[in-house]
């Protein structure tokens, strides 16, 4: 009986994880692979987000659906397992390079 409950919960979690909101047209500049030496952020057009950061010797990572934008900031995850990414500088072009500042970290779009 417990196995069936666990299996049902796992299926529900997988189903909900695929329920991200697509990136709205006015935020399409957020889509892409962003990175610095200590942070990696992938935002896909369909609303999937992958994040990894090394800070103070601790690695934090997260994968989940995009829940939406609040101004320049965006929310990722489900319920209590969600996080708000604070964007102090939304995507902008500096010469040939696209940049964005998320959670105080300057990120570059594209391979480094």
Region locations from a protein language model:
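N-terminal glycine/threonine-rich, aromatic-flanked beta-hairpin/loop signature
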Residues: 38-83
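Bacterial signal peptide processing site
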Residues: 20-22
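Low-complexity, intrinsically disordered Gly/Pro/Thr-rich segments
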Residues: 83-97
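Tryptophan-anchored aromatic micro-motifs
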Residues: 26-40
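Edge beta-strand at a domain terminus
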Residues: 99-112
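Bacterial N-terminal signal peptides that target proteins for export
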Residues: 1-8
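Short, linear, compositionally biased motifs with a strong N-terminal bias
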Residues: 10-13
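C-terminal motif of bacterial Sec signal peptides marking the signal peptidase cleavage site
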Residues: 15-18
